[in-house]
Amino acid sequence: MRRVCFTGHRPEKLNKSEAEIVASLEREIRAAITDGFQTFISGMARGVDIWAAEVVLRLRDNGSPIHLIAASPYQGFERAWSPSWQHRYASALAGADIVRFISP
């Protein structure tokens, strides 16, 4: 089984818009699927990690035979985030095929 892992900068550290980054992520994820990758792992941090997870979930829900593993640092990792990011995190976690918390 071939896997892709996502890690990336937080949104405030980026010099491109969310829309530009998400479009780039989608192109690369589609290319990875074409190359035979089926499992995608996200560290679930704000920014690139969650955006990538959202793209994977959307493509999976539209019929791509892929899986998302959410590898979150620990339960409650998102508590200090804005409500918007907390919602996106919770939605991605709920949609993931596998959820793992790395630290107790």
Predicted ranges, named:
Residues 1-104:
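Acidic/glycine-enriched connector segments
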